[in-house]
Amino acid sequence: MTISETWLLPDGVADVLPEQAQVIEKLRREAIDFLAVRGYQLVYTPFIEYIESLSSLSESNQDLDLVTFKVIDQLSGRLLGIRADMTPQVARIDAHVRPVEGVARYCYAGTVLHTKPQNFNATRAPLQLGAELYGHDSIEADVEMVYVMLGLIENAYTLQGAHLDLGHVGLFRSLVKYAGLSKNEEHELSDLYQRKALPELAEFTQNLNMGSDFYALGRYASDLDALQVHLSADILKDTEFDAALNALKITLEQIKNRWPALNVGIDVVELRSYHYHTGLMYAVYAPNRAAPLAQGGRYDGIGEHFGRARPATGFSCDLYALGANQFAEIETVVAPKGTEADLLKAIANARSEGLRVVQLLGNDDLSSIPYATHQLVLQNGQWNIEKI
């Protein structure tokens, strides 16, 4: 083994050095505090669990199973999974460990591990931060979660130039149910919508039951007013479809009232998480970034695997992505060596004010502290901090 092989890291894994680690940790602390004052209680979840627990979403989210590292437990011989997403762990807590009646709000922050990057240039070990609301199936709960997500991004990053995408899988799902489509037809439509293949969609829907409605859903996916004009009266009278459309309208209106300058887009056929989400979906993007800063949605029934299905909505983000290209310039005060009481008191006072103070050791001098910005000097019997 060469020396280089001992310090090389796997693809998609990187060290976080002090200048950026300080930024990331500040973001984490402020985000947790932001969520705490809104009633979201912090939970810590284990880094490994039996795969049966972590794969509770595998039937509805095959992608999660594919990115989960699996190892054999040397104690029990059972298969363990290294968490790739903390959502199923929080679902287990809500369903079994802490079965609260009524609304429960949780937040979390911790490293997750992926077998492969989730998008171009992404890390395989994101620092995932998220918030989840259990026990309330309402538009108000969805709107609260979008508000919390946007508020957090506004505090930690910025909403200037940001773009919010809104969607609702209930529109497509209820239309499929109303039309009585087969699984193959449903899968084909989902693929066409994802590829935005309008010519192919027009051809495919010609002989499809409710075909004009399925075409309208793709053709006017980003314009709710035009969509309503081109949908049939039958589907507009459907209770489930109407509820989904109404939820999307109300959410859009309330977000516009709260953040009038925010660029908000609608895409009713954004179905990447169709088999996982059950209602409203949302994602916020920064300019010149392909991957979302944060994303989430409704996923009712997530705790069913643990014996307690409950309405749920939530979002998550990667703190490394939020803190990318941000580097802290930390002021460092250098104190001379010595054990005099007044010197030690001056050092303690500076640290109590939040300053970073490094005391010289042995034969060290200022040149041995390359990141020093200030020094503690004795003047007229008083210790003062001076800029270097």
UniProtKB/Swiss-Prot annotation:
Q: Which Pfam families match?
A: tRNA-synt_His
> InterPro entries of this UniProt entry?
aa-tRNA-synth_II/BPL/LPL (IPR045864), HisRS-like_core (IPR041715), HisRS/HisZ (IPR004516), HisZ (IPR004517)
What keywords does the record list, in alphabetical order? Amino-acid biosynthesis, Cytoplasm, Histidine biosynthesis
Gene3D superfamilies in the cross-refs? Bira Bifunctional Protein, Domain 2
Classify the source by domain of life. Bacteria
BP term (GO), one: L-histidine biosynthetic process
Would I find Methyltransferase among this entry's keywords? no
The pathway it acts in is:
Amino-acid biosynthesis; L-histidine biosynthesis; L-histidine from 5-phospho-alpha-D-ribose 1-diphosphate: step 1/9
> Which terms in the GO cellular component ontology are assigned?
cytoplasm
Question: Which residues fall in a coiled-coil region?
Answer: none
Q: Localized where?
A: Cytoplasm
Matching HAMAP family, A to Z? HisZ
Q: What does this protein do?
A: Required for the first step of histidine biosynthesis. May allow the feedback regulation of ATP phosphoribosyltransferase activity by histidine.
PANTHER family, from UniProt? HISTIDINE--TRNA LIGASE (PTHR11476:SF7), HISTIDYL-TRNA SYNTHETASE (PTHR11476)
How does it associate, per the subunit comment? Heteromultimer composed of HisG and HisZ subunits.
Similarity field? Belongs to the class-II aminoacyl-tRNA synthetase family. HisZ subfamily.
Q: What else does the entry mention about this protein?
A: This function is generally fulfilled by the C-terminal part of HisG, which is missing in some bacteria such as this one.
Q: What is this protein called?
A: ATP phosphoribosyltransferase regulatory subunit
